[in-house]
Amino acid sequence: MSCEQHYRTLIDKYIDGEATAEERQELNEHLETCDACFEYMLEVRKVVAFVQSASHVQAPEGFTENVMKNLPKRKQTNRFKVWMRRYPLAVAAAVFVLLMSTSLFSMWSSDGEHVTVTGTGNVSIDQESGRVIVPEGEVIQGDLVVRNGELIIEGEVQGNVLLVNSSQYLASPGSVSGEIDEVNQILDWIWYHTKKFLTKVIDISDEKNSPSS
């Protein structure tokens, strides 16, 4: 049995929590000298972290039942599990596109044309004119999201600003400490959340980059 086959089997057992103490020690010693197996371990960990992080995203009601009804009857096998470990990045991308696109499209469609604001602090909202005003002297702690309005910042936002179908006016430079993103189409909306979600996934996977963790 080759190095790749033997130690990838050990990696699979380690990820599933089925490896013995002797096998874990053998694997750790091998990973110190084998870059290929170490990279494979990192890829599998990233897939696990990705799926765990995406567990809060829900598909539309009845989605699972409709899919199961159309599936052909077949004996249960471990082919998907093997394929997932062989192509972890492809599986991660497929899961992300399916769940996130469905959820984000639903969120985008439900926004309507009303002016809405997400954030903490004293913000003035005028539904008729569509103006959202951060008054002079007011400091918004955290991120601010404005939908279908015109954001006028006379105070300060200590965080990021997301404008969805909105425009902005800054009374003074530096009034926003974070980034300002404008989203005016559904593809921009999906791309914004894609970047935000993948950033979280990378942060989680970086924390788990050691086999002994």
Swiss-Prot record:
GO terms for molecular function: metal ion binding. It is a single-pass membrane protein. Is processed by three successive proteolytic events. First, the extracellular region of RsiW is cleaved by PrsW (Site-1 cleavage) in response to cell envelope stresses. Next, it undergoes cleavage at an intramembrane site (Site-2 cleavage) mediated by RasP. This cleavage uncovers a cryptic proteolytic tag with conserved alanine residues in the transmembrane segment, that is recognized mainly by the ClpXP protease, which completely degrades the protein in the cytoplasm and leads to the induction of the sigma-W-controlled genes. Residues 1-86 are cytoplasmic. Pfam families: zf-HC2 (PF13490). The chain crosses the membrane at residues 87-109. Its cofactor is Zn(2+). It comes from the Bacteria. Its main location: membrane. It is found in: Membrane. Binds 1 Zn(2+) ion per subunit. Zn(2+) binds at H30, C34, C37. Residues 110-213 are extracellular. Disulfide bonds: none annotated. One of its GO terms (cellular component) is membrane. Keywords: Membrane, Metal-binding, Transmembrane, Transmembrane helix, Zinc. Is the anti-sigma factor for SigW. The presence of RsiW leads to the inactivation of SigW, and its proteolytic destruction to sigma-W activation. Belongs to the zinc-associated anti-sigma factor (ZAS) superfamily. Anti-sigma-W factor family. This is Anti-sigma-W factor RsiW. The lineage of its organism: Bacteria, Bacillati, Bacillota, Bacilli, Bacillales. The gene is rsiW.
